[in-house]
Amino acid sequence: EELAAELPGSFIAGQFENPANPDAHYRTTGPEIWSDLDGQVDAFVAGVGTGGTVSGTARYLKEQQPSVHIVAVEPAASPLLSGGKAGPHGLMGIGANFVPKNFDRSAVDEIVPVREEDAYAAARLLVRAEGVLAGITAGAALWAAGELARRPEFAGKNIVVLLPDTGDRYLSTPLFAE
């Protein structure tokens, strides 16, 4: 904001509070998922960074089918969304240590806290088993989706998990140290 005050005509995107963020996912991500799966979406899992992806996508999917189960993923070490306290964590991309204005809690059915080591394990499994070089945040979302898939009520159901980051930015981190 200080820089914007100094630079006439500048623009601050404000990704944590700008309603264009969830609206973009309402207009694009949600319809793409719905169309690609011919409306056969039983659950949607996404990490919460700005809150825009999960909130906008959830709003669209729930308009199509109110029973779609929406899962928001947050760091277990900083479980603000589920009523805990902010804390340091290594899940870059989610868990901003405040509740973003763009996070619509009413659109979410469940919040799953994920431990750093579980996110790392899921990201490593994804690269080893599928050849998908995903990042830490993707690992967290995948781990949460796996937990959901193990529940009897989700057996045989279509669970969509959004993998928001690539692993190339983590090659020199503990994620790929093994």
Language-model regions, residue ranges each:
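Short, well-ordered alpha-helices that flank and scaffold nucleotide-derived cofactor binding pockets
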Residues: 35, 59, 63, 143-151
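Short glycine/serine/threonine-rich phosphate/pyrophosphate-binding segments
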Residues: 47-58, 137-145, 170
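Phosphate-binding loop/pocket of nucleotide- and phosphate-handling active sites
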Residues: 146-178
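Active-site/ligand-binding loops adjacent to catalytic centers
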Residues: 4-9, 63-136, 174-178
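Phosphate-handling active-site elements
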Residues: 40, 63-72, 148-158
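Glycine-rich beta-alpha junction loops
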Residues: 17-20, 49-52, 74-79, 85-86, ...
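Active-site/ligand-binding-proximal alpha/beta "capping" segment
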Residues: 7-48, 105, 117-132
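Hydrophobic/aromatic beta-strand patches that form the interior of the parallel beta-sheet core
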Residues: 11-13, 45, 71, 112, ...
